[in-house]
């Protein structure tokens, strides 16, 4: 992702065809070392392509991917209906998650009561 971001920065900065050196310079300015193999792959894949078209294609792919918990909830509901004992382990998992969250919250102040 860092290589794509640096490539986009170079293109948006006016360099229509950034070289590996250009990308390394951008990444180096924020302290990131570039791996030549990955860098060359990104440059090879994006070279000569219109960035706006690449971004539009990416948005199209992302919009077609399912996101959120709707699919997981439907799958979980079907499993509980199919197996009568499927609901008990789920309840145990929820209890464990709540317990872990409360332990994490108690560690937030690390023993220092700033407002006590």
Curated annotation (Swiss-Prot):
Task: Describe the subunit structure.
Answer: P1 and P2 exist as dimers at the large ribosomal subunit.
- What InterPro entries is this protein classified in? P1/P2_N_sf, Ribosomal_P1/P2, Ribosomal_P2
Which portions of the sequence form the region Disordered? 60-116
| Leader sequence residues | none
Here the segments flagged for biased composition (Gly residues) are 67-87
Q: What is the lineage of its organism?
A: Eukaryota, Metazoa, Chordata, Cephalochordata, Leptocardii
Q: What does its PTM field state?
A: Phosphorylated.
Looking at the keywords, is Ribonucleoprotein present?
A: yes
Xref: Pfam families: Ribosomal_60s
Write out the biased-composition intervals (Basic and acidic residues).
91-101
Name it: Large ribosomal subunit protein P2
Q: Which family does it belong to?
A: Belongs to the eukaryotic ribosomal protein P1/P2 family.
Annotated keywords: Phosphoprotein, Ribonucleoprotein, Ribosomal protein
Its annotated function is as follows:
Plays an important role in the elongation step of protein synthesis.
């Amino acid at each position: 992702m860092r290589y794509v971001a640096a490539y986009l920065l170079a293109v948006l900065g006016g360099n229509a065809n950034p070289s590996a050196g250009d990308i390394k310079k951008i990444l180096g300015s924020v302290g990131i070392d570039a791996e030549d193999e990955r860098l060359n792959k990104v440059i090879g894949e994006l070279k000569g392509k219109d960035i706006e078209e690449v971004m539009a294609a990416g948005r199209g792919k992302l919009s077609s991917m399912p996101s959120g918990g709707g699919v997981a909830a439907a799958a979980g509901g079907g499993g509980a209906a199919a197996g009568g004992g499927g609901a008990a382990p789920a309840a145990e998992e929820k209890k464990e998650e709540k317990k872990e969250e409360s332990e994490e919250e108690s560690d937030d102040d690390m023993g220092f009561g700033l407002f006590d």
